[in-house]
Amino acid sequence: MSWHGFKKAVNRAGTSVMMKTGHVERTVDREFETEERRYRTMESAAKKLQKEAKGYLDALRAMTASQTRIANTIDAFYGDAGSKDGVSAYYRQVVEDLDADTVKELDGPFRTTVLDPISRFCSYFPDINAAITKRNHKLLDHDAMRAKVQKLVDKPSNDTTKLPRTEKEAAMAKEVYETLNNQLVSELPQLIALRVPYLDPSFEALVKIQLRFCREGYEKMAQVQQYFDNSVREDYSNGLLDDKVEQVLQSMRDLSIAGLNNSQ
């Protein structure tokens, strides 16, 4: 920060303190405050959307990676028994394809049509925030100069040129502030209104990507069903699968090895 900038920062800090103590009257612009609140709400929502969009892509990768680990474990658990009908090996192959093909094929389109546009939208916020900060600084300058003019009016200086000179500086400060303020009051609503048409294509792309992932996942998993006995699907549909599982558990409990610990 330059020396000139440092002095301005100190003067503005002093003006803020004097406003709090009632020595300098603060300009209140309800219209700007309303538009700034609306902008802050949109900024917060957009940043959250950016975070969640990235999280969605990470979650897809994590889910398919977890499926792959489960499939490998199931295949190892089945061992030779699974090789008889091939169900565990086929299931492993299906989830590996889902991870290797479907998710990786969706990665590029998701970034191009969803994540990158949202990130570009959010990239404008630092410039807008800088403009708002500059406007607030110019408002402090305007209020400070107005207070100086009023002080000279209430208590005239021996230097007769001081009041006209200060009034000129105050008019310039007011013009700079009002130019920035009017620009923000005019353009912030336009930015907020543009958010929907800008993000609509990304929203549509997100739905299509989700649809493709779910459809291809369903189609691949549905193929695994052909390896299961028809009676298993019928028992599941008729609510009889729990009984069948209980029968298997009872058979396990009936094994002599299961009762060795109780016999000691």
UniProtKB/Swiss-Prot annotation:
Residues 25-65, 165-187 form a coiled coil. Keywords: Cell cycle, Cell division, Coiled coil, Cytoplasm, Cytoskeleton, Septation. It is found in: Cytoplasm, Cytoskeleton. GO terms for molecular function: cytoskeletal protein-membrane anchor activity. One of its GO terms (cellular component) is actin cytoskeleton. Gene3D superfamilies: Arfaptin homology (AH) domain/BAR domain. It comes from the Eukaryota. The keyword Coiled coil applies. InterPro entries: AH/BAR_dom_sf, BAR_dom, BIN3/RVS161-like, Rvs161/Hob3_BAR. Pfam families: BAR (PF03114). GO terms for biological process: actin cortical patch localization; actin cytoskeleton organization; actin filament organization; division septum assembly; endocytosis; mitotic actomyosin contractile ring assembly; plasma membrane tubulation. SUPFAM superfamilies: BAR/IMD domain-like. Its main location: cytoplasm. This is Protein hob3. It comes from Schizosaccharomyces pombe (strain 972 / ATCC 24843). The lineage of its organism: Eukaryota, Fungi, Dikarya, Ascomycota, Taphrinomycotina. The gene is hob3.
